[in-house]
Amino acid sequence: MKLLLLSVTMALAGCVSLSVPSFWDDNQSAAIVSVRQSIENINCAEPHAPQAADVQQRLRWFELYSESKGYAQQDVIRLVQPLKETVDDFARRSNEKQGSKTYCELKKSTLVDQASTAARAVLGRF
């Protein structure tokens, strides 16, 4: 009996560490596609700062909306964290000084990959 009780306790304790993914949300889906589109539209021949600011603002809307929905959205917020860090770095450096076209293209490539991954995850929820 003690062994059964111990086994049940251990099984339930293991379930506590599992997180339940958040569910589909139309607004989040539209917002992450908007972020992705603004990244795809970056033109490295043009000034980088305003383009980076646009991506930053769209991503911030996504974050604020997700935070406003509550704790259940923590998975989505963690999901876009790497993208946010890359966007913030691009915006900061672009505000300090216009980077080279090569720098922009490399940063854009990274952002495209990160945004694509985030969009697939957000749109793939049920």
Locate the predicted segments by residue:
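Sec-dependent signal peptide recognition
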Residues: M1-T9
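Bacterial signal peptide processing site
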Residues: V16-S19
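Post-signal-peptide N-terminal segment of Sec-exported extracytoplasmic proteins
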Residues: S34-Y65
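Alpha-helical transmembrane signal-anchor/signal-peptide segments
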Residues: P21-S34
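C-terminal motif of bacterial Sec signal peptides marking the signal peptidase cleavage site
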Residues: A11-G14
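Short, low-complexity, Pro/Ser/Thr/Gly-rich segments in the mature regions of secreted, periplasmic
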Residues: K107-F126
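Long, amphipathic, charge-rich alpha-helical segments that form helical bundles/coiled-coils
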Residues: R58-E105
